[in-house]
């Protein structure tokens, strides 16, 4: 296993250069906040089936809260939030965001690694333990999830979200191409990523508004990238004696009317169904092939061949 602190310092260095969790301008009258706030509400209400009403009057801790641009929506729904973030610059932004869009004095801000928080002081103290888009960048996901789970009260909720391993495989193949062509030169990594995956970056910007460079730093410049599968996540929940409920994405089977993703008592069926969906989704790689063909350089041909090999293997399953 990679050294926890070495990985953390590398990640911190990257995210001090570009903060990937900045989605709107810090002005109440700027429509970018309202756009983002509505997207967050849609995600929780319809995607996660955990509507804003569930946050009202509850205590919540957010591990890896970043700039607070996401957490502030949960606060506006009535949660009393504790934000844990190792990037002091991002935490300063979070304080400003909460001052602008919430009642900052009702919330707490802790500048710390998630591994270094006072686990005795905060154990089972929160109605909701929350972390999204964080564990994919740590060296020990299982240990980090155990910490997250320990913070929730008995009968409380753990909300965990991250990239999926099938998307991670795509990104690892993309990283093979980028690093083969650009080496470790940060500027070259940015330029090659833009050249190779312009369409992909554009989709990311449209989906979650932020700068193109922020997307590139979050996906290709960052050194630590290790995404869990749905099966991994189910194991995390079971190992910590948590009831696993997932409502997004949905798999609706003909004649049943109910997605297995909403059945917390059928994790085996969920793992099987999720494996199929992950593999089908992973081979949908149209959009970048012409850009790949147009580049000549070390590693680009290998990247294309590897994509084809993976796709053929999955089609033969």
Per-range role (PLM):
Residues 67-78:
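Conserved SAM-binding loop of SAM-dependent methyltransferases across substrates and taxa
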Residues 34-57:
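Conserved alpha-helix/loop element of class I SAM-dependent methyltransferases that forms part
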Residues 94-95:
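Conserved SAM-binding loop
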Residues 87:
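Conserved SAM/SAH-binding beta-strand->alpha-helix loop
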Residues 211-317:
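Rossmann-like AdoMet/SAM-dependent catalytic core
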Residues 142-154:
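A short glycine-rich, Lys/Arg-flanked "PGG" loop and its adjoining helix->strand segment in the class I
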Residues 157-198:
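Conserved class I S-adenosyl-L-methionine
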Residues 130:
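A conserved beta-strand element that flanks and buttresses the S-adenosyl-L-methionine
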